[in-house]
Amino acid sequence: MSRHSRRMRILCLCATTLLMAGSALASEAGGHADGQLKDFLYRLLDFGITFGALYFLLRGPLKRALSARRQRVAEALEQARQMQASAERRFAACRQQLADADAQIAQLTADLKAESALQCQRIEEQARKMADDIRSEATRSAAREIEAARKQLHQEAVRLAMELAEQRLKQQIAPQDQARLVDEYLRKTGE
């Protein structure tokens, strides 16, 4: 506030006070009809001056206060609009995240089912392969066992045949034939 406007306000306030005091004195002094008109005019003049002085004195601060109030209300409204827009954006983002989460859950479920089916198929294939390997090994092992048993039976048959042949020879060969065979054998080996 400038010095000039402050001085003017003080001057107006003093003039208003003097006029009010004058009108108060005038209203006490008169008692007749002409005095009533004067009193009414003084009061009217007093009201006009008081109203003018108050208007002059309060116009600036009141205007600034109302302007500041208007600005605060406008700022509050703008801030409320921004907060509402921000809340709506966050709400839309949350709604989108929920929709995305539902889609992700469905995708994960489908992926897990597919992976589970593949895993079951792999396990079945491995089990079949292991069963085939076990069968093949059992067949080879049985073939080896059969071959070993054949060889053993063959050896046993040869041994039994030799024993039988030896017994028959012992029964059929006389001691003279035996001496002759030994002599022949010694001659052949001695040569």
Swiss-Prot record:
The keyword Transmembrane applies. Keywords: ATP synthesis, Cell inner membrane, Cell membrane, CF(0), Hydrogen ion transport, Ion transport, Membrane, Transmembrane, Transmembrane helix, Transport. Disulfide bonds: none annotated. It is found in: Cell inner membrane. The keyword Ion transport applies. It comes from the Bacteria. It is a single-pass membrane protein. Its main location: membrane. The chain crosses the membrane at residues 7-25. Belongs to the ATPase B chain family. F(1)F(0) ATP synthase produces ATP from ADP in the presence of a proton or sodium gradient. F-type ATPases consist of two structural domains, F(1) containing the extramembraneous catalytic core and F(0) containing the membrane proton channel, linked together by a central stalk and a peripheral stalk. During catalysis, ATP synthesis in the catalytic domain of F(1) is coupled via a rotary mechanism of the central stalk subunits to proton translocation. F-type ATPases have 2 components, F(1) - the catalytic core - and F(0) - the membrane proton channel. F(1) has five subunits: alpha(3), beta(3), gamma(1), delta(1), epsilon(1). F(0) has three main subunits: a(1), b(2) and c(10-14). The alpha and beta chains form an alternating ring which encloses part of the gamma chain. F(1) is attached to F(0) by a central stalk formed by the gamma and epsilon chains, while a peripheral stalk is formed by the delta and b chains. This is ATP synthase subunit b 1. The lineage of its organism: Bacteria, Pseudomonadati, Thermodesulfobacteriota, Desulfuromonadia, Desulfuromonadales. The gene is atpF1.
